[in-house]
Curated annotation (Swiss-Prot):
Belongs to the EPSP synthase family. MurA subfamily. It comes from the Bacteria. Keywords: Cell cycle, Cell division, Cell shape, Cell wall biogenesis/degradation, Cytoplasm, Peptidoglycan synthesis, Pyruvate, Transferase. It catalyses: phosphoenolpyruvate + UDP-N-acetyl-alpha-D-glucosamine = UDP-N-acetyl-3-O-(1-carboxyvinyl)-alpha-D-glucosamine + phosphate. This is UDP-N-acetylglucosamine 1-carboxyvinyltransferase. Pathway: Cell wall biogenesis; peptidoglycan biosynthesis. GO terms for biological process: cell division; cell wall organization; peptidoglycan biosynthetic process; regulation of cell shape; UDP-N-acetylgalactosamine biosynthetic process. The keyword Hydrolase does not apply. Its main location: cytoplasm. UDP-N-acetyl-alpha-D-glucosamine binds at R93, R122, P123, V124, D125, L126, D308, V330.
Amino acid sequence: MDKLIITGGIRLDGEIRISGAKNSALPILAATLLADTPVTVCNLPHLHDITTMIELFGRMGVQPIIDEKLSVEVDASSIKTLVAPYELVKTMRASILVLGPMVARFGEAEVALPGGCAIGSRPVDLHIRGLEAMGAKIDVEGGYIKAKAPAGGLRGAHFFFDTVSVTGTENIMMAAALANGRSVLENAAREPEVVDLANFLNAMGAKVSGAGTDTIVIDGVKRLGGGRYSVMPDRIETGTYLVAAAATGGRVRLKDTDATLLEAVLHKLVEAGAHIDTGSDWIELDMKGKRPKAVNVRTAPYPAFPTDMQAQFIALNAIAEGTGTVIETVFENRFMHVYEMNRMGAQILVEGNTAIVTGVDHLKGAPVMATDLRASASLVIAGLVAEGDTLIDRIYHIDRGYECIEEKLQLLGAKIRRVPG
């Protein structure tokens, strides 16, 4: 199993390019199953989850064509099986996103209950209830969700999400694109990745309006056709590198990104003492060598502060001046990284859904273990600011969400290397 070794204490300085958003690329890839002609998706990040989704397509008889620039052409007309098997689905929660498109386009689907990061319960009941509202008959047995559309296809429905669910919104929105009649989704997720998926569906001929608000309206169409679409930049990768630079007192310029996607994060970085400039497709952060100030953070669905940036800000607060609180309202059990950071000398106290972080002058390198995707990123940041060497184990979590993380950090001057397991 690969490991990362980081020698800390170096200020990050330089320029890197931000990759396409994993959390946008995965639903967009799933949505290609709705089209009856080839679709090309560009700006895909080179990540394990993307590879797994493409491998899943191959198992189903769809043969994607990938070029050297990580664009992929998908022709779903060649699909041979409507089963998403457990051995692939178990490693990636986003595989549930093929459920809606397959039922809508082919009338049935059999998808193993998904895996992915072990963060709280993350139930799939909203996906199931949404499809049932559209007339699908669904059974959950033997670890599989077995869904069948009614004769004549799915019917448009008015569906209210009891809790805001990004993947739930995406799955039902995709299914509704080919349903008969109008669907109205209330209390829908407002995340930019949902908007990106809606834009992709509309580029294929769908009629989706309201994405980015809590009410999305979809008028079903008879067919969706191919086209070419570029995935939006990854706002969480953007935020992670900005926090890494801030924690080390450094300066970075990030290209091919969009400052409007993470205003809540930028606001907190300014509060921490960062100087930030932005353009249409770049962000520059400069700490001017200063130690950051502790900030208080409360996670909530977009456009509030994202839960996927919570762990990184705990790492920032760990070496900041003062004490900051981080309140997690989206997922339970999302402070597993705290115990690893405390082994490095951090002073973090967890009380329920709140982490109280008292900044220390420095952390000390230590062997630590990644527990989930964003927790791993926070340990990388901690390693960058720590004295001595930090060895991070189980970095397959990092590879699920960050493209070439060690190469990008090396471009910024970090001493980091991967050791094959």
